[in-house]
Regions:
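Context-gated lysine
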Residues: 15, 31, 37, 57, ...
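Surface-exposed amphipathic alpha-helical segments
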Residues: 2-16, 122-199
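Signature of long, low-cysteine stretches enriched in small and polar/charged residues
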Residues: 31, 62-116, 120-129, 133
Length: 199
């Protein structure tokens, strides 16, 4: 990969070999902790193939139209990196079999005549569901949600009328990331923060 395509990523990611069927000029990385494992790939794309920078609503609407039953939208954001490059990203969660959750990041960063596509897959590893259960029990004890129907626990972050698939739950709010730093969603958001602040 030539220098202009390089994106600074956290140093705890290990470089991996790419496969022949991977996109041209791609680089792959992996990372594993006690609670998550990650596979990440970066490669250049044409700017016209990038998500629309600055237009979060178009991305949200597109994802809502494409989600499968076992998936849910967690986050869509756009902005400018420290080095004044436009970026936009989405995080979608997907149910793993037999248990656990995968958080899929798609992030585009505008370079000049092209964009970099970052695709990462952070999976729950070890004991799954710990974050959800801990926060759910806390909220039940505080009277914020009530069994058995758990009204308000599951909610699309951008459209409360959207009910399809596996909706985001309250434990996935960013405010709980610090309590579960090795959870795959926390790892995903920390990765995004690093990329925005170091590119």
């Amino acid at each position: 990969m030539n220098n202009e395509l390089l994106i600074n990523i956290p140093t705890d990611f290990q470089k991996m070999n790419t496969l022949p069927e991977d996109p041209a000029n791609s680089v792959a990385y992996g990372k594993q902790t006690q609670s998550s494992k990650c596979f990440l790939m970066m490669f250049p794309i044409n700017n016209q193939n990038a998500m629309p920078y600055g237009n979060e609503k178009a991305v949200i609407d597109g994802i809502h139209g494409a989600l499968a039953d076992g998936q849910g939208l967690v986050e869509v954001k756009s902005g400018i990196t420290k080095n004044q490059k436009r970026y936009i990203y989405s995080i979608v969660k997907s149910k793993l079999e037999p248990s656990g959750m995968q958080y899929i990041l798609t992030m585009h960063i505008e370079m000049n005549d092209h964009s970099i596509n970052i695709q990462s897959y952070f999976d729950e590893a070890g004991m799954t569901g710990f974050r959800d259960t801990s926060i759910m029990n806390k909220m039940i004890n505080e009277g914020k949600i009530t069994p058995p129907n758990m009204d308000g626990w599951f909610k699309d972050p951008y459209d409360e009328n959207y009910k399809k698939g596996l909706l985001m739950n309250l434990s996935e709010n960013v405010e709980y990331d610090a309590m579960f730093p090795q959870h795959p969603l926390s790892e995903t958001r920390n990765f995004i923060k690093y990329v925005v602040e170091n590119n």
